[in-house]
Amino acid sequence: MNSRLDYYNASPKAMKAMIAMEALTRDLSIEPALLNLIKIRASQLNGCAFCTDMHSVDARRFGETDRRLYAVVVWRDSGFFSPRERAALAWTEAVTLLAESHVPDDVYALARAQFSEGELVDLTMAVSTINSWNRLAVSFRQAPGG
């Protein structure tokens, strides 16, 4: 599949803003290993092969195991994830699939049990940012590894 256009060259100003948002997510309170997991899960849900690939590679660089990476897609049925990671993955799914059910109260309660108010805002910003990246990459058919 060929990319439809190079969005970095097509709108440098817009991409500068996206890069600034991405940089911000790295400075928030969510640990890098968890950020990679939520980026992978949101990218899977959005059908973004480019971002799923990129963040899986990043996760391995941070020491993530292949076994856990393979299980992200079925995290609910896997014992590989901590309560904090499970809460973050549930929150990621709810925020990513917002139009389906908004964010259910039980998902919010699970997230609040694991994250402070500030951390939950930070997590939501990270989920929002990866969703924006996914929409760019999917819309313009950015190929994995490219």
Regions found by a protein language model. Name each.
Residues 1-146:
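Hydrophobic alpha-helical segments
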